[in-house]
Structure formats: structure tokens, C-alpha cells
Amino acid sequence: MHPTEVTSYCWPHHARIEGAGSCRRTTCSTATDNRQYVLTCRCVSAGGFWRPFGHYQGRLGALVTISHRDTDTVFIDELRKTCESTNINFLLGAGCSMPEFGTLGNIETLWAQLKTSETKERIANEHGDHANLIENIIEASLKASFFETAILPNRDYIKTNTKETKENYELFCRAAMKLVAKREASTLPKQVTFFVSNYDICMDVALDMARIPTNSGYVGRFNPLVDLSDFGRRVTTSTLTLGYQSEIASANLVKIHGCASWRKKGGGIEFSNEFDLIEEIERNIDNLCQTAQQANPTQDPGLQGGLFPLNSNTFNELIEQATTHAHKFDSDSVNKLLDSFKKLQIVWPTKQKFHDTVLDEIYYAQLRRLTNQLEVRNSVLIVAGFSFADEHIRKLILRAADTNPTLKVIILCYNEQSERDIKENLLSECNTIPNDNVTTVTAMKPGTGHIQGNLDLNTVSTLLKMVSK
């Protein structure tokens, strides 16, 4: 029996349990209509308490079947069988790069509110001639917070002692590649595709450290350019005497949102290890703050180290902060900082991704590649460190799960709270997953299994090692 944790917003009345064993079916009707719906239930205690294996929502009786599993031996055996016979894909989010890199929190939500016509009208009415400055300060503040969380740590990632994160990524890459290294059937490639929603260089460094042949989307050695045709190439080795060829395990690396190391060059984008742009942006942030301090020597502690500490949880608080500090900033310095942000070749975490970036073509191509991979028969997408707050990726994955019944989406959740947040994000998008092919996974409680505690990247690596045995 596998314990099931499901958020059930509307568990219908008049439910009737049928069948026997650890898995039963429930026929039920709602109080608002007389239609009959069938839900799968599993026993969650020795006393025979039953709970719906999925999510029932609303009067129309739509059923969302998001399965839950624990990292017990049965799940590990099933995952082993899945990986032996499928095309393997991973989706890695910001949670994998902690503690060196932070998560973005509610920045995307605040950004979306800034761009609404209602917000622009409100700022214009309240601040008149200073409305543009207030709006620019808010945008610069959000981008500065994002920069310090997701971009700035890349500069020192290679040089400084970030041993824990580097080792975790390298161990993960090695464990993931072992899933395909011993494959003998030519119908399945010895290849793993890694989709990364982060902006960091952690996977780039880890694949190099593990010496894994990688299709990374870069062409050239001294000044590598981003070339999206450089994917899917399989690596083989052959003997000199007999000419026998065998495939070597290789990886595809897809940076969906771009990378902190990408730079504009002519009509293309190059990969650079110089990080000079990051240093330029950091200088502009520091100069802006120093200018504010010089103009206001009695500055209150609300301006420390950056434009705003962004400890505001709501947009109203953010507007209040911007209004309070507006007189401290020179508009030219704010605009200079915003111009330097535009040089970053990344897809900013806004809901208007398709409208405010020069990377539209690359972004579309990366999403198409993710779509194409998930449409392949007998594929699995293993997700780690990703909250599904990203609207575009969330919709894409749910659509693929709907149209491809042979696809399995396995979401490795950091802890139970993370699982609840992920389910909430998924259920906000749709009210049915008819193929029952989306599963959330949490680790066993301490003392109850081999994989226990929180499913961070290191624990995920341990899980994959057990799967590849």
C-alpha cells in the first residue's frame, strides 16, 4: 500500500467504496447534479481509511488525477523499469542550484502587476510628472533583486569555493548518465536530455567536470556561438581493426531561458566566460546607491546594498517603497542601470516573455524542442527543483501529458509543502489530466526507507544511483 497525500478541494458526498485490496474505485455523485463519477482510491492507513487518488473539483465533476508516490522500493523498481524502456528527459529548476543561487519568489507576480494598464494609470494619477521615474525605480528594483539572486553568483561560481553545489551537480550528471550507459538496444539512444530553466552555469560546469559528451547548443571553440542545430547528435566510437561501432552515452543541454554567460555578438549570441557585463551591472547598481547616499547623508536603513531589499510581499508595499525613496535617485542613473540590464541575453521572468526580449526566436525554438521531446512515444520527464510557477512551461507540459498517453511526468518534490505548492500551480492550469500520467514524489519520512528527508539534488542523485543498479 502506498500512502497518498492529495489536496481535495471538493470531496463529493454520497461516495460508495467498491472492490477490495489496496486500490479500490469509488462511485459518487455531487450535491449539485446527479452525474456519476469514478475516482480511484488507495488505503492510507492500516485501519482502512480511504482517500481519493487524485483531485475532484467543481460542479462539472472534472477529475484531476495527480498521483502521489513515496520513494519506497516499489517506486524505485518501477522507475528503473521506466528508465530502461523510455527516452529520458530531465527538467531542472532553481531549487537544484541552492544554496549558491536563490529562488525568485514572487518577482514574476510583482513584475506582471507593474506592466498592467491599471498600475500605470494608478502611478500616473498619484505621481503626475514623476510617474515615469516611480515606474522605472520599481522595474530597476525588481531587476536588481533578480540580478543579485540569479545572475551575480555566476561570476564567482567557477573561481570560489562552491564545492557542495558543484559536487552535487557532478554526482547528479554521472548518476543520470548511468541510466542509459548500459543500453544495448539500438532503438533507444544512449542519450539524456537536460532542460534547464535556470540562468546559471551549474550544468555547463558539471557536464565538463564529469567529462560527458554534450550537445550544448554551442558551435566553435574559442568564441562559441549559440546554434540550436547542435542537438541530438549521438556519439559513437569504433575500433581501428574491425571497424565495430558502439554508442557512447551523451547528453543534450537545453537552456530554456538563456544563460548568464550569453552575450550579443553581431546578429548572434556567443558564450563568454569573462562576466564583464555582470561586473558592469554591479557597478551601476553600486553607483546608483552611492549617488543616493551622497544626496541623502541621513539616509534611513531602507536602502542597503541594493536598490531595495525587496522584502515587500505585495505590490502596494513595493509602490510605497518606491515613493519613499524616489527623491533619492537621479533619473539618468536609473535609466543607465535599466539599459545595462537590457544587454543580458536572457528571458526575463515576466509573464510577457514573448513580447519584451530579443531572444524570441531562441526561446520559441527551445520550447519547441521541449514539446518535441515530450511528444516522442515512451518518454519520461523527471522534474526536480521546479515549482511549475512558470506559466508557459507548465502549459506545455500539461498539454503534452494530455496528448501523449505514453509520456510519464515524474515530479520530485523537495518536501510536502513543495508538493502542495506544485499541485496548486498545476491545478490552476487545468481541471483534468485524463491519462493519469503525472505523478508527484516525496521522500520517505526519516527511519522508514533508503531515500528519506528532503529531495534536494544530492538526494535525487542517490535515488538515481539506486535506480541504475
Describe the residue ranges of each PLM region.
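SIR2/sirtuin-family catalytic core signature
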Residues: 59-90, 243, 311-337, 344, ...
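Cysteine-centered motifs
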Residues: 10, 23, 28, 41-43
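Residue-identity detector for glycine
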Residues: 19-21, 47-48, 54, 58-61
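A short acidic (Asp/Glu
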Residues: 99-104, 203-208, 265-267, 391-397, ...
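Extended, H/D-rich, highly charged conserved domains that either
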Residues: 192-346
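Gly/serine-rich nucleotide phosphate-binding loop at the start of the catalytic core
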Residues: 56, 61-224, 246-249, 254-257, ...
